[in-house]
């Protein structure tokens, strides 16, 4: 049986990347909350 998690960096960035977060109001809200919490990585596209 094939496992459900088949990791792909491209798909990951397309769905949870910085550009996508900035594109929507709720995404920007997520970023602001993560900035307020002083997260090292805001999105998955951060290294």
Curated annotation (Swiss-Prot):
Gene3D superfamilies linked to this entry: 1.10.287.3980
A GO molecular function held by the record: structural constituent of ribosome
UniProt entry tagged with the keyword Ribonucleoprotein: yes
Keywords for the protein's UniProt record, in alphabetical order: Ribonucleoprotein, Ribosomal protein
KW Coiled coil (keyword) present: no
Domain of life: Bacteria
GO cellular component: ribonucleoprotein complex; ribosome
One BP annotation, GO: translation
One Pfam family per UniProt: Ribosomal_L34
Family: Belongs to the bacterial ribosomal protein bL34 family.
Descriptive protein name: Large ribosomal subunit protein bL34
């Amino acid at each position: 049986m094939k496992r459900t998690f088949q990791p792909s960096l491209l798909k990951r960035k397309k769905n949870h990347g910085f550009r996508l977060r900035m594109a929507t109001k709720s995404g920007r809200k997520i970023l602001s909350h993560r900035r307020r919490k002083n997260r090292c990585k805001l999105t998955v596209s951060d290294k």
